[in-house]
């Protein structure tokens, strides 16, 4: 435990700390897998068990898949609209996670989920819209902060944690539905997603980034074209100019 704490505190930003960047990327992917597993497994099983027509379930599946089909649209958007002083990707990740929480919480106010399946489908579409935005933003963050020799390991770890989140959301939470109800299971996910959101809220991407608007920058923001040495290994960082790093998100 002491070793983990030491690794976490070794360097203030993701660029400076390998342990922080790997853990952060994996936890953010867990946040995507949790509601995805719930939606595609537990929620669909609940609908089927309560007599929802197959055609309504098919429409639900098709609708929530749309944001993922066209998520390539997010790439140019998050590259174009940036607030460098807070990190290039961090504001987008926080925005996406906030949208995921709000859209999921809104379902709690639907009086009868079975009777209002069309409304729930719209809300889950919005939820997946924000989830796909987080997916693209986290992948972009990985490209920015990972070093070339970390990419394969990070990609595998991120894929595994997302699938782990899907197992928790689908199987574990699904087993709670018969005893506690579907809305109780949704309520469990909301604080979990909020807790995960605290991670990027208090982490800097690069030295000099501000966490909040009222905070003074610790130092001048490092420009991407500058060659910077990793304090841990003395190797060039993956976000320097003209890097040939390639990353594929899970």
What are these regions (language model features)?
Residues 7-68:
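Helix-loop boundary and gating motifs at the non-cytosolic
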Residues 67-71, 152-177:
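Glycine-rich segments within core transmembrane alpha-helices of 12-TM secondary carriers
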Residues 93-115:
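C-terminal ends and interior cores of transmembrane alpha-helices
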Residues 95-102, 184-202:
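Symmetry-related core transmembrane helices of the 12-TM Major Facilitator Superfamily/SLC fold
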């Amino acid at each position: 435990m002491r070793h983990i704490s030491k690794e976490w505190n070794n360097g203030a930003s993701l660029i400076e700390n390998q342990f922080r960047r790997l853990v952060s990327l994996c936890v953010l992917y867990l946040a995507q897998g949790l509601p995805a597993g719930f939606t595609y497994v537990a929620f669909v099983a609940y609908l089927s068990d309560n007599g929802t027509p197959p055609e309504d379930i098919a429409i639900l599946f098709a609708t929530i898949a749309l944001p993922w089909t066209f998520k390539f649209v997010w790439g140019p958007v998050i590259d174009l609209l940036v607030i460098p002083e807070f990190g290039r990707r961090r504001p987008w990740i926080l925005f996406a996670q906030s949208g995921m929480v709000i859209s999921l919480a809104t379902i709690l106010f639907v009086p009868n989920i079975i009777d209002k399946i069309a409304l729930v489908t719209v809300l889950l579409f919005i939820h997946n819209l924000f989830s796909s935005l987080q997916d693209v933003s986290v992948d972009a963050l990985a490209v920015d902060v990972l070093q070339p020799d970390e990419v394969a390991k990070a990609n595998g770890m991120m894929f595994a944690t997302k699938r782990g989140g899907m197992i928790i959301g689908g199987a574990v939470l699904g087993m709670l539905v018969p005893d506690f109800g579907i809305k109780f299971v949704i309520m469990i996910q909301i604080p979990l997603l909020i807790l995960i959101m605290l991670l990027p809220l208090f982490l800097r991407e690069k030295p000099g980034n501000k966490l909040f608007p009222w905070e003074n920058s610790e130092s001048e923001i490092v420009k991407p074209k500058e060659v910077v040495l990793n304090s841990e290994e003395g190797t060039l960082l993956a976000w320097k100019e003209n890097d040939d790093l390639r990353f594929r998100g899970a």
